[in-house]
Amino acid sequence: MHHFHLLKAARVKKETNDSVNIAFEIPQNLRHEFAFKQGQYLNLRFVFGDEDLRRSYSIVNAPSEGNTELEILVKHLEGGKVSTILNNELKEGDQVEASAPMGHFYTHYHPSNEKTYIGLAAGSGISPVLSNLKEALYQEPKSKAYLFFSNKSLNDIIFKKEIDDLTEKFEERLKVIYLLSREKHFEDELFEGRISAEKLSQLFERFPEIPVQESTYFICGPSEMIKDISGYLKNDKKVPSLQIMYEYYAAPDDDENAEMSDEFKAIPNIESMVTLIIDDDEYSFHLNSKKKSILDQALHDKLPVPFACKGGVCCTCKAQVMEGEVFMEKN
């Protein structure tokens, strides 16, 4: 079970017009539980009456920077209850419920490695990418890193000061390329527009020193960008899949736009008995195959099940098929 603890906001800093950087203080007695790896995320919990809201936010800092604080970035979403509170109402000293860091968006570093790491990020997708690149630079003195970072305008570049400071600190080993999609700021048209397979191909031509096939990639941004870039790297540049890591901030297809799978449409209405074992306690309920998901029904019955995103992204809740077949409603 994922236990939630109250963490105090040590710093609340407006990063851009629509995003805030929050540093949570980790007390001594929780530092073991909240030990983290680069690229992981925090689950935050907010309870409004009967409404239990969970949100996952990537950790921005790197383990090499210390374990006394965890930093996250929260981008304001129109109509988003939690993001509005964190952007507009949270103050230094306020407390927020959080559970221990989770996630698998990272690789392992070793001081003897001499590798190249490529970060490809758009907007708030910079958070886990930056965490990974920082840890690589701190842990592997012979390795190099490139960051290709797309934003709408110069003022929208998240963590620009920190990134620029890092380029000075690691000037021989870190190269940062900003791309702007809605502002003509650079003389070179190559740095206009979003990151795409076509744009990445042009960037590789501009920076021929990048060992494309041998590099390790961290990608985070809109789902279409991730699919486009990862497909290009695997299929066109023959980069091994194990060297391409990506993190979705939302399910790959928006629920309202995704087509219901043919396999799921063909499933008849089936009434099943579901049994959950949670911390050695057993719970059972009836479930119709065409209605609520197991998680939604469990939450409806107020069962203490662990969850975070409810969108098939965070992997807080997982299932293993032991017998029979499973068809995804939307795949």
Regions found by a protein language model. Give the residues of each.
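A structural signal for short secondary-structure junctions
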Residues: 210-211, 266-269, 299, 308-313
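Residue-level detector of beta-strand face positions
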Residues: 23, 43, 273-275, 318-320
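Local cysteine-cluster metal-coordination motifs and their immediate loop/turn environment
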Residues: 303-328
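Short beta-alpha connecting loops at secondary-structure transitions
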Residues: 150, 330-331
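Ferredoxin-reductase
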Residues: 2-95, 99, 115, 151-153, ...
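Hydrophobic, well-ordered secondary-structure elements that form the walls
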Residues: 244, 298, 314-317
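FNR/FR-type flavoprotein reductase catalytic core
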Residues: 84-268, 273-275, 282
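C-terminal accessory/binding modules appended to enzymatic or scaffolding proteins
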Residues: 269-306, 322
